[in-house]
């Protein structure tokens, strides 16, 4: 599996180029998510109760030859609202929105949302302080990308 270097997105112009490169995630699906809080309980049962990492990694697979599978990393996660479709409905993403508001990056699984729409949006919404992504090659299909070594 080839995992190229991460590409960090910081500006509205970089978001626009990224979204155009991904065709606004048309004909895509959220395959997997992995969250790292930073909090843990150690071997002696002492707790480190601080969410000082808050990193969400999300794998998207697309029906497109270029960048068919990407991993998106949301750093300093502030909000994750996950609204998965159940098995009676299809879950493909037809369009998406990514914007910067108040210094945070928002990603939603619906297109043409404005800053004013974010609070009322009932689909999947992610808000984080930072964002980066990378293309993942030779890993299409149902096999899990994030798997435990235990």
Explain the meaning of each model-derived region.
Residues 1-150:
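Surface-exposed, interaction-prone regions used to assemble/regulate multi-protein complexes
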């Amino acid at each position: 599996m080839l995992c190229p270097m991460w590409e960090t997105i910081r500006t509205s112009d970089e978001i626009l180029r990224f979204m155009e490169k991904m065709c606004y995630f048309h004909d895509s699906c959220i395959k997997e998510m992995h969250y790292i809080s930073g909090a843990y309980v150690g071997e002696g049962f002492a707790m480190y109760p601080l969410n000082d990492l808050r990193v969400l990694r999300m794998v998207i697979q697309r029906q497109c030859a270029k960048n068919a599978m990407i991993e998106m990393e949301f750093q300093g996660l502030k909000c994750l609202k996950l609204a998965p479709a159940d098995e009676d409905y299809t879950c493909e993403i037809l369009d998406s929105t990514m914007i910067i508001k108040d210094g945070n990056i928002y990603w939603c699984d619906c297109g043409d949302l404005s800053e004013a729409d974010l609070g009322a949006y009932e689909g999947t919404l992610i808000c984080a302080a930072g964002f980066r992504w990378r293309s993942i090659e030779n890993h299409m299909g149902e096999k899990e990308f994030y798997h435990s070594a235990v």
